[in-house]
């Protein structure tokens, strides 16, 4: 693990950069200046060079889409090609775990670390966790971090493909779900690597539940989806007695 020296910071919006408006808190641009001002106010700020970019427009992460994930992927690959050796992605917490998982697979075999963070309260709000999370993530990258996608939140490093948001009322909102591994790492085929062009997919996800009817499933399949992912019960089973 090599210390990151030339960081790319990608700001997507989210709570961390929200500002008060007459309609309440809203995603806002201009976070680079706020970040620089805060780091300059620290006596022991992380010592690494960084370049800042904003996803346009800044998002409330509840509005995250596949297209946004592809834009993030393109920006990160371009940053790698421009000589950056690490990425810090600032993201809203509602869908941060989804984006971390998506990027984990969109960026398979990426040779640099990608760290996602955000906050439960906006930067500058009383008692906010924003600057602690951001500066903590910078310190992790400065000290050296393995390649791949991970989440830094509330002093914890979490695997990007196994993180879930479990709470909305506390700073320790995220946890890494356990998954035993019994296999060895294998080379990533070129068709799955981060250089492979991607496109949006009309995908639906359906968790199974008691009372689900075949007509519900048929209506979803007839809606024009390209693929349907079924979230089955724990052992992979589902209802089978609907004669429709």
Briefly describe each language-model feature range:
Residues 2-231, 237-244:
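Active-site histidine-anchored catalytic micro-motif
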């Amino acid at each position: 693990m090599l210390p990151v020296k030339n960081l790319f910071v990608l700001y997507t919006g989210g709570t961390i950069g929200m500002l008060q408006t007459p309609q309440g808190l809203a995603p806002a641009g201009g976070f680079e200046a706020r970040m620089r001002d805060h780091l300059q106010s620290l006596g022991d700020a992380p010592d690494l060079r960084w370049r800042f970019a904003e996803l346009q427009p800044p998002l409330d992460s509840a509005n995250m889409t596949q297209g946004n994930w592809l834009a993030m992927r393109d920006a990160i690959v371009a940053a790698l090609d421009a000589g950056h050796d690490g990425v810090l992605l600032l993201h809203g917490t509602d869908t941060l775990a989804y984006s971390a998982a998506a990027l984990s697979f969109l960026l398979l075999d990426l040779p640099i670390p990608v760290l996602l963070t955000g906050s439960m309260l906006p930067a500058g709000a009383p008692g906010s966790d924003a600057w602690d999370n951001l500066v903590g993530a910078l310190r992790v990258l400065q000290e050296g971090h393995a390649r791949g996608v991970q989440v830094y939140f509330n002093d914890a490093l979490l695997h990007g493909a196994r993180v879930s948001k479990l709470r909305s009322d506390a700073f320790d909102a995220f946890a890494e779900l356990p998954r035993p591994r019994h296999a060895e790492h294998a080379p990533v085929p070129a068709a799955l690597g981060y250089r492979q062009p991607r496109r949006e997919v009309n995908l639906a996800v359906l968790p199974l539940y008691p009372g689900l009817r075949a007509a519900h499933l048929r209506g979803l399949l007839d809606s024009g989806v390209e693929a349907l992912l079924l979230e089955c019960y724990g052992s992979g089973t589902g209802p089978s007695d609907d004669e429709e």
